[in-house]
Amino acid sequence: MGLIAAAIAIGLSALGAGIGNGLIVSRTVEGVARQPEARGQLMSIMFIGIGLVEALPIIGVVIAFMTLFQ
């Protein structure tokens, strides 16, 4: 049971992060296409957003390990 819970935790967190990263990058590319002069600011905001989104799979892996080794 713990193995299935760990797999679900990792899978769903990776799925959510992938969708989130795709949306962030697509909106950034769209913004740069509309206003090329704002590229630097948009890119820095994008990297901050991607960093926050990538925290989700890390937390998912930690929860999976806690479930496996409990």
Curated annotation (Swiss-Prot):
Positions of the record's site feature: Reversibly protonated during proton transport: 54
Pfam families, A to Z: ATP-synt_C
Domain of life: Bacteria
Assigned protein family: Belongs to the ATPase C chain family.
Binding partners and assembly: F-type ATPases have 2 components, F(1) - the catalytic core - and F(0) - the membrane proton channel. F(1) has five subunits: alpha(3), beta(3), gamma(1), delta(1), epsilon(1). F(0) has three main subunits: a(1), b(2) and c(10-14). The alpha and beta chains form an alternating ring which encloses part of the gamma chain. F(1) is attached to F(0) by a central stalk formed by the gamma and epsilon chains, while a peripheral stalk is formed by the delta and b chains.
Name of the featured protein: ATP synthase subunit c
GO CC annotations, alphabetized: plasma membrane; proton-transporting ATP synthase complex; proton-transporting two-sector ATPase complex, proton-transporting domain
Keywords: ATP synthesis, Cell membrane, CF(0), Hydrogen ion transport, Ion transport, Lipid-binding, Membrane, Transmembrane, Transmembrane helix, Transport
GO molecular function terms noted in the UniProt entry: lipid binding; proton-transporting ATP synthase activity, rotational mechanism
Function: F(1)F(0) ATP synthase produces ATP from ADP in the presence of a proton or sodium gradient. F-type ATPases consist of two structural domains, F(1) containing the extramembraneous catalytic core and F(0) containing the membrane proton channel, linked together by a central stalk and a peripheral stalk. During catalysis, ATP synthesis in the catalytic domain of F(1) is coupled via a rotary mechanism of the central stalk subunits to proton translocation. Key component of the F(0) channel; it plays a direct role in translocation across the membrane. A homomeric c-ring of between 10-14 subunits forms the central stalk rotor element with the F(1) delta and epsilon subunits.
HAMAP family (UniProt xref): ATP_synth_c_bact (MF_01396)
Entry's transmembrane regions: 4-24, 45-65
Entry membrane topology: Multi-pass membrane protein
Alphabetized InterPro entries for the sequence: ATP_synth_csu_bac/chlpt, ATP_synth_F0_csu, ATP_synth_F0_csu_DDCD_BS, ATP_synth_F0_csu_sf, ATPase_proteolipid_c-like_dom, F/V-ATP_Csub_sf
Compartments where located: Cell membrane
